[in-house]
Design a protein with these regions (language model features):
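N-terminal helical cap/lid subdomain that shapes the substrate entry/recognition surface
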Residues: 3-124, 138
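Asp-based, Mg2+/Mn2+-dependent phosphohydrolase catalytic module
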Residues: 1-12, 20-22, 38-46, 109, ...
C-alpha cells in the first residue's frame, strides 16, 4: 500500500479540510476592508455591496476552457474593481486586502486535529504545502492561514486563481509537485471532497486521503473504479498513522 511508504510531502486542501466556515457574506468582508482604507468615509458599505453584485453579474461563473476545465477568477480583480470604483485608497498590499476580506466574510474555525497533525508532519521532516480551489492569491491565502494557524509550516501555497485551472484538473497538482522538485508519487494529498481532491490527486499520480467527518468508521479504505484510497473521519487518525509507520 502507498500509505505504508513515507511521503516526501503532504499537501492540503483548505476549506472543509483545514477550516470549517459559516455562511459567506461579501458585505461583511467589504465592510471590514472599507475600514482598512485610508479614506473609509468616501464610500459606504451599501455602495461596496452593490459594486460586488455588479461585478459578479458581469463576470458570471462556471467558465470553462476549450478542454472542459473549470476556470477560476482571482479575488484581487474583484477587489480592485470594487475599491477603485468606490475611490478607496490603501497603504497595504492587495494580498493584505484579500486577507482582511477573507477574515471577515464568514465565521471560521480550525478543524479539530489540524494543529497536532501539522506539528507531527513537521517533526517527521515531511514537507507540507497547499493546493486549493480558491479565488485568493497564494500570497493572500498564506496570510489567511497564518492568521488562523500561527504555527503552520507550509512551504508554499498554490491556488486555482494563481494559474486559473481548478481541481480536479491534474495540472494544478503536477504544478505543485514540479515546484517542489518532487515526483507526484512521493506526495500525499488531503482533502474533504471526492471529485476535486481524491479524483484529482489520483489523476496526477498523488496518493489521496479523504476526510469524511460523517463516516462512522474512523479509518477505512474505499474503492472506486478499482482505485483504493484512505478515508478518515478525524485528523487524529492520520496523525496516529504517521507516528506509527514513520
Amino acid at each position: 500500500m502507498p500509505y505504508d511508504k513515507k511521503p516526501k510531502m503532504i499537501l492540503f486542501d483548505v476549506g472543509g479540510t483545514l477550516f470549517a466556515g459559516g455562511n459567506f457574506s461579501a458585505r461583511n468582508g467589504l465592510a471590514a476592508l472599507r475600514l482598512a482604507a485610508l479614506n473609509p468615509q468616501d464610500t459606504t458599505d451599501d455602495k461596496l455591496a452593490l459594486l460586488w453584485d455588479e461585478y459578479s453579474e458581469k463576470i458570471g461563473g462556471g467558465h470553462k476552457s476549450p478542454f472542459g476545465v473549470t476556470l477560476d477568477f482571482p479575488l484581487s480583480g474583484a477587489l480592485r474593481y470594487i475599491t477603485m470604483n468606490a475611490g478607496l485608497r490603501f497603504d497595504i498590499s492587495v494580498a493584505e486586502q484579500e486577507e482582511i476580506f477573507d477574515r471577515y466574510n464568514s465565521d471560521r474555525k480550525v478543524i479539530k486535529g489540524v494543529t497536532e497533525l501539522l506539528k507531527t508532519i513537521h517533526s517527521l521532516s515531511i514537507r507540507a504545502a497547499i493546493i486549493s480551489n480558491n479565488a485568493m492569491s497564494s500570497e493572500g491565502l498564506g496570510l489567511a492561514i497564518k492568521h488562523w494557524i500561527p504555527e503552520e509550516n507550509m512551504e508554499f501555497y498554490l491556488t486555482s486563481s494563481d494559474i486559473l485551472l481548478t481541481k480536479p484538473c491534474a495540472d494544478i497538482f503536477t504544478t505543485a509537485a514540479n515546484y517542489a522538485h518532487l515526483n507526484p508519487a512521493d506526495c500525499w494529498y488531503c482533502g474533504d471532497s471526492k471529485r476535486p481532491d481524491v479524483d484529482g490527486a489520483i489523476g496526477a499520480g498523488m496518493t489521496p486521503i479523504l476526510l469524511d467527518v460523517n463516516s462512522s468508521a474512523p479509518y477505512e479504505y474505499r474503492t472506486d473504479a478499482d482505485r483504493e484510497y484512505l478515508v478518515i473521519n478525524h485528523w487524529n487518525e492520520l496523525t496516529q498513522h504517521l507516528k506509527k509507520h514513520f
